[in-house]
UniProtKB/Swiss-Prot annotation:
Compartments reported by the entry: Secreted
Cofactor: record remark: Binds 1 Ca(2+) ion per subunit.
Cysteines joined through disulfide linkages: C38-C97, C52-C144, C54-C70, C69-C125, C76-C118, C86-C111, C104-C116
Signal peptide location: 1-27
Top-rank EC class of the record's enzyme: hydrolase
A GO term, aspect molecular function: calcium-dependent phospholipase A2 activity
Function statement: Snake venom phospholipase A2 (PLA2) that inhibits blood coagulation and shows bactericidal activities against both Gram-negative and -positive bacteria (E.coli, MIC=0.4 uM and S.aureus, MIC=0.1 uM). PLA2 catalyzes the calcium-dependent hydrolysis of the 2-acyl groups in 3-sn-phosphoglycerides.
Protein name as annotated: Basic phospholipase A2 BFPA
Subunit structure: Homodimer; disulfide-linked.
Alphabetical list of Pfam families matching this protein: Phospholip_A2_1 (PF00068)
E.C. number(s) listed in UniProt: 3.1.1.4
């Protein structure tokens, strides 16, 4: 084998080994985004930095009904984690969307069904809650105590 080809092959193998340590993209969050779009009117990015609980983490008192939806979703994921090896952010599930109706179709009691039920409830809650633009991108350190 040509030494140049051997070096290229070695470089590809090393790259693949390095890529194996990169965490997978969360497919569940992609499904959650699709559920939100099926049930509601806002684009999912409108919720990422909303209030005290929408997006990563959450503390303090929810600012409004929509923020309470996010707090409830966080608690729902916490409960789903109690079922064995259930990691909600990475667990994919089966559901159907007939706008605006969402139906989770995995077996009841399974990790996938529990996570789907959490996302379904949140998507429906988001669709029913008013969106207060003043609560988007707030300083969580001062508003969420």
């Amino acid at each position: 084998m040509n030494p140049a080809h051997l070096l290229v092959l070695l470089a590809v193998c090393v790259s693949l080994l390095g890529a194996a340590n990169i965490p997978p993209q969360s497919l569940n969050l992609y499904q959650f985004k699709n559920m939100i779009q099926c049930a509601g009117t806002q684009l999912c990015v409108a919720y990422v930095k909303y209030g005290c609980y929408c997006g990563p983490g959450g503390t303090g008192t929810p600012l409004d009904q929509l923020d309470r939806c996010c707090q409830t979703h966080d608690h729902c994921y916490d409960n789903a984690k109690k079922f064995g090896n259930c990691i909600p952010y990475f667990k994919t599930y089966e559901y159907t969307c007939n706008k605006p109706d969402l139906t989770c179709t995995d077996a009841k009691g399974s990790c996938a069904r529990n996570v789907c039920d959490c996302d379904r409830a949140a998507a429906i809650c988001f669709a029913a809650a008013p969106y207060n633009l003043a609560n988007f991108g707030i300083n969580k350190e001062t508003h969420c105590q």
